[in-house]
Amino acid sequence: MAMRTIVIRVAAGAALVLATLANNANAQIASPILNAVEVQKLVASADPVDNARLSAHFAALAERYAREATRHDAMAQAVIASPIRRTPANTAADHCKRLAGLNTQAANTLRELAAYHEKRAAGAVASVPKGVAPFHAGTGAPEPSDDELSALAARASTPADHHALEEYFQTAAKRYREAVNEHSSMAQAYRGTRIAQAAVHCDRLVSLSRDEAKEATAAAEMHKQLATAGR
């Protein structure tokens, strides 16, 4: 009986250690990269903690772009060295080299942006670097999940919250307007062909996308007004 108790205690202790290690590992690998809506929200904040989060986010993005630059450089070299070429070597390599150059440029801009927010987090005066507007708008950041969007919509109370939702709905409205144009073009292409009935389906999608764009635009305007009223 005593031996059985010891075995149970050892097993329980081992399970606790494994759980602790797993939690520590998860904490260590947690990504500092924010979603696009979080970036848009925090950019409007002067809070040191928010700026520290932005600094970590942009620094992590810079490393990602730097890795992509290295990858595209390696691809360019591989294309040039390959004995089997299905595309002109110079053309394919040039594409990869240009991508690497753009990746490097983005990485450098993001490092400057990370340093800017690091200074703001420390309370220092700093000037916004040039060319950072796309990254402040969420370029490079992942889209928020459904749960994250629902949580933000449910607790939105500050101007920053409403501004982030305004940006989200503006982006959604733009996407729906692009869908209107796409489905309109497809409807035109189908008319006069043997499958002209497909144009009717495209017309329905045009109408649906138009309504979606209208609602998203209205939601963006509402959050814009709420953001202004809360200042």
Could you say what each language-model-derived stretch is?
Residues S55, C96, E166, C202, ...:
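Hydrophobic packing residues in well-ordered alpha-helices of helical domains and bundles
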Residues V37-L42, E68-H95, D146-S150, R177-D203:
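Short E/K-rich amphipathic alpha-helical oligomerization segments
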